[in-house]
């Protein structure tokens, strides 16, 4: 199966919270996991914020960040390019999206168009899930099992 993970879903792989078990299961199967290059910065920043807010110890932060960096090569990563952003203006005209949400959805649309395949959009943000559904994606929110 092919999955696109936005950062709200991806973080559940490296920080235990509601929906983490489901996200972990994606890594145990022979799935294709797609992400945007921006997820790299977003994920590390999210882990650092959890460290600052004392939700992660320094040791656990380092462990999570290193694990993420090691697994990064397992993802199919879309670079942030003009080709990926070709439909960005039309997308934000149709939907009230925040900047990085627009990048993630635009990237998933680019993957779908390029592969001509169904992609399950995985996201823990209800608004982005609803928008992705409107754009024709199958959607899974790991927090709503």
Model-derived regions: residue spans:
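Short active-site oxyanion
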Residues: 30-33, 74-76, 115-120
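Acidic, PIN/NYN-like endoribonuclease modules and their adjacent C-terminal/linker elements
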Residues: 2, 106, 110-145
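Alpha-helical elements of the RecA-like P-loop NTPase motor core of helicases
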Residues: 21, 86, 129-130
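Helix-adjacent hinge/juxtasegments
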Residues: 49-82
